[in-house]
């Protein structure tokens, strides 16, 4: 027959297990989409939540943590290989690193992106907030890379292999109605910004040939 002490210990264990289950939300729950969600649904949910919880727009104390959580969920679910591995091993095993083992794993790839060009070209959060916006993205992905022991690759001309940045670049091209491809499957995006307090003009030139993108900034003073 169970004693009061054993019943109490059992109740505490059940409570702790319940709290752990509730605290460990799946990536689908974080983005608010069903497990059967399409790539388009996942992308749409991420963009909506990222704009809502971006620390430059949302001043609540937990906004930055929420934003990083959203970005991490999207980084996994937007990649077909990662999503399959995540669905196979489950959230707990995946986040503990069991879903990141094996030779040639897609999780070993490194994401390096020029955040200055991203925010300067598209000005998502206002010109005066570009630096802070860039830093929030940089800090998240640097932390995520360090935690996963990913190899860093430095390059100037790079290929978007899918995932967060390719999706954002593609959506922004459509949003701002950039010119289409010519016969060489290449297009150039040029933007010009006047910096406050100076007569200096800078333009960012982005050239894309297939999946290869090269971006540089050309500045001239008057």
UniProtKB/Swiss-Prot annotation:
Subcellular location per the Swiss-Prot or TrEMBL entry: Endoplasmic reticulum lumen
PROSITE patterns documented for this protein: DNAJ_1, DNAJ_2
Domain J: 26-90
Family annotation (InterPro entries): DnaJ_domain (IPR001623), DnaJ_domain_CS (IPR018253), Hsp70_co-chaperone_J-domain (IPR051948), J_dom_sf (IPR036869)
Gene3D superfamilies: DnaJ domain
Any one GO cellular component localisation term in the record: endoplasmic reticulum
Residues of the signal peptide: 1-23
GO biological process entries: B cell differentiation; ERAD pathway; negative regulation of IRE1-mediated unfolded protein response; positive regulation of immunoglobulin production; response to endoplasmic reticulum stress; response to unfolded protein
Family matches, as CDD domains: DnaJ
GO molecular function: Hsp70 protein binding; misfolded protein binding; protein-folding chaperone binding
Keywords of the record: Chaperone, Endoplasmic reticulum, Phosphoprotein, Signal, Unfolded protein response
Phosphoserine modification, residue list: 133
Keyword Signal belongs to the record: yes
Role this protein plays: Co-chaperone for Hsp70 protein HSPA5/BiP that acts as a key repressor of the ERN1/IRE1-mediated unfolded protein response (UPR). J domain-containing co-chaperones stimulate the ATPase activity of Hsp70 proteins and are required for efficient substrate recognition by Hsp70 proteins. In the unstressed endoplasmic reticulum, interacts with the luminal region of ERN1/IRE1 and selectively recruits HSPA5/BiP: HSPA5/BiP disrupts the dimerization of the active ERN1/IRE1 luminal region, thereby inactivating ERN1/IRE1.
Record PANTHER family: DNAJ HOMOLOG SUBFAMILY B MEMBER 9
Notes concerning its domains: The J domain stimulates the ATPase activity of HSPA5/BiP, while the divergent targeting domain is required for efficient substrate recognition by HSPA5/BiP. The divergent targeting domain specifically recognizes and binds to aggregation-prone sequences.
Oligomer status and interactors: Interacts with HSPA5/BiP; interaction is direct. Interacts with ERN1/IRE1 (via the luminal region). Interacts with DERL1.
The name this protein goes by in its record: DnaJ homolog subfamily B member 9
Organism field: Cricetulus griseus (Chinese hamster)
């Amino acid at each position: 027959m169970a004693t009061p002490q054993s019943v109490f210990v059992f109740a505490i264990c059940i409570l702790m297990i319940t709290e752990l289950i509730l605290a460990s939300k799946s990536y689908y729950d974080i983005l608010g989409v069903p497990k059967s969600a399409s790539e388009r649904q996942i992308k749409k949910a991420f963009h909506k939540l990222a704009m809502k919880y971006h620390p430059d727009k949302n001043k609540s104390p937990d906004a930055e943590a929420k934003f990083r959580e959203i970005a991490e969920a999207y980084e996994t679910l937007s990649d077909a290989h990662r999503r399959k591995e995540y669905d196979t091993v489950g959230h707990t095993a995946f986040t503990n690193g069991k879903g990141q083992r094996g030779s040639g794993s897609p999780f070993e790839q490194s994401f390096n992106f020029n955040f200055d060009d991203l925010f300067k070209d598209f000005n998502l959060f206002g010109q005066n907030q570009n630096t802070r916006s860039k830093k929030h993205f940089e800090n998240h992905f640097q932390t995520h890379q360090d935690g996963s022991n990913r190899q860093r690759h430095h390059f100037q001309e790079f290929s978007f292999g899918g995932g967060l940045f390719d999706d954002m670049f593609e959506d922004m091209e459509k949003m701002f109605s950039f010119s289409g491809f010519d016969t060489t499957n290449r297009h150039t995006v040029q933007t010009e910004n006047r910096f406050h307090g100076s007569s200096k003009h800078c333009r960012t030139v982005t050239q894309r040939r297939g999946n290869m993108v090269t971006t540089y900034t050309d500045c001239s003073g008057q």
